[in-house]
Amino acid sequence: MRDIAVLELLFATGVRVSELCTLGYDDVRLEEGEIKIYGKGAKERFVQIANPNVLGALHCYQEAYKDVITQSGAFFVNRLHKPLSDQSVRSIVNKYCRLAGVESHITPHMFRHSFATLLLEEGVDIRYIQRLLGHSSILTTQIYTHVAGKKQRDILLEKHPRNKIHFA
């Protein structure tokens, strides 16, 4: 239950592993559908969770472990009721990759890359993605956004102004 909530949150929000691990019980506001993140440089941001399945996974975890997580103060805890570590999150990702038969080496940070890239490919403004990821500089965000060659071609065919000019 916890593992699914961790994986769902990583992919749905693009949070850094360190941000997920330091997420406090009071930082998760499921009724409002948002989490408060303390990013690099002690920057605070709010990230919305719009997907009902993600909210459901977080709610199930929160209800099942309410006593433990309220007592510890951390939202995601290990079996010793301590906050999850970065290594624990890597182990969770590896475990579910093995179970799914994924042979490629997948890291938790790849969820962040995928989050940014998929939003960009769906036409989301890079400045909005920058805010979601908590980047100070747009240059940092551009590193995360790998647009596939075919997608670039489709965008150019569909959006480039030259395609709307027809000579007789």
Where are these regions (language model features)?
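Conserved catalytic core of the tyrosine transesterase superfamily
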Residues: M1-A168
